[in-house]
Design a protein with these regions (language model features):
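Membrane-interface amphipathic segments in extracytoplasmic regions
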Residues: 1-191
Length: 191
């Protein structure tokens, strides 16, 4: 059976890929039995899994990554967020997983994504519980849970330009409003 792990940026896909590649190198699973990355879609045959992340934490991580790569839209996290469309996870799943028309209104996108998370995915995981979700994935794939490779390399790979503790309550409230559909998905499927 083919297992598809759709990776929304900054939701643990690299960590998962490193662990699966380790198990494939040890001949516990064939690389033909799974797909992990940004390019799996609703049309990819197999059982589908996805991780969501707290929207503010995901956006902070994405900003820090972009800053390190000199690809950020602005010099501060707050400025950067205000330049973006918002609801990154909703828009990503709608366009890149469902392959749907990106010009549709955001309510349509949200409702379609919500239904897809219910119907298309065997499991929607929370990145905040990655180790427990890894246990489930390892058991489904019948691969060893251990070793748990140190796969979260962000502290070593790039500097933290933005941090949740340095954000004002006013900005956090704005972020929740501006990304309301992402928060709704996260609350429904991950809390």
């Amino acid at each position: 059976m083919h297992h598809c792990f759709h990776h929304i940026p900054k939701t643990g896909g690299s960590s998962l890929r490193i662990r699966l590649e380790d198990r494939a190198d040890k001949k516990q699973i064939s690389k033909l039995d799974y797909a992990v990355g940004h390019n799996t879609t609703a049309k990819t045959p197999g059982t589908h899994f996805v991780w969501l992340r707290d929207p503010l934490d995901r956006d902070i991580s994405h900003f820090n990554y972009d800053m390190e790569k000199d690809e950020a839209q602005a010099n501060t996290f707050e400025e950067s967020c205000k330049l973006l469309a918002g609801n990154f996870m909703t828009l990503w799943i709608y366009k890149d997983y469902l392959l749907s028309d990106p010009t549709d209104d955001v309510e349509t996108k949200y409702q379609s994504v919500r239904q897809a998370l219910k119907d298309n995915f065997v499991k929607v995981f929370s990145i905040e519980n990655f180790e427990q979700s890894w246990n489930e994935v390892a058991d489904i794939l019948k691969v060893d849970r251990e070793p748990r490779l140190n796969t979260n390399r962000s502290n070593e790979d790039y500097k933290k330009y933005a941090n949740r503790k340095n954000l004002s309550e006013e900005f956090i409230s704005w972020h929740k409003d501006y990304n309301s559909y992402d928060y709704l998905l996260y609350e429904e499927f991950c809390t």
